Amino acid sequence: MNPKFLLLMSFLSFFGCGKKAPEYPADTLTTRDGTQITLTFFKHASLAIEAGGKCIYVDPVSGYADYAALPKADVVLITHSHYDHLDVAAVEAIQTPQTEILCDRTSAEAFEMNCYTMRPGSVATPRDYLKVEAVAAYNTTDGHLQFHPK
């Protein structure tokens, strides 16, 4: 085999190893009006929704992402107060004085700021571009019924 070819392949292999896949999987969708929405999944229930320069986080948890390195939040949605959905340190890493937090009453007690407190059936419009309706959700998987009882 040609030594120059081997050298070239070795060189390319060496530098190709330094490339990393994106740290967090993301999908970008285009709405009917042409708006691009990017959904970034971190882990478990933690994700980010970005559109039109706005960033909404759902259940940010520090163990799932480096929130200090991510864009600041316009809105944070906390689904409930379990440790794998509510992490005050993660919220503090992404919040600004203008960040709106929407959560249930129990989760709101963890924050030193006013939150939109929600319960199933309630609707909030924290920003003119966002309307959120709370719905009841249950974990009906065998062995998990005690975590989200109906």
Predicted regions and their residues:
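Sec-dependent signal peptide recognition
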Residues: 2-8
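Short, linear, compositionally biased motifs with a strong N-terminal bias
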Residues: 10-12
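C-terminal motif of bacterial Sec signal peptides marking the signal peptidase cleavage site
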Residues: 14-16
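Core dinuclear metal-dependent hydrolase active-site scaffold
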Residues: 20-71, 117-150
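Active-site metal-binding motif and surrounding structural segment of the metallo-beta-lactamase
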Residues: 62-107
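Short, conserved acidic/polar surface loops in the N-terminal third of protein domains
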Residues: 88-89, 113, 143-146
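Glycine/small-residue-rich loop that forms an oxyanion/phosphate-binding "nest" at active or ligand-binding sites
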Residues: 102-106, 111, 115-120
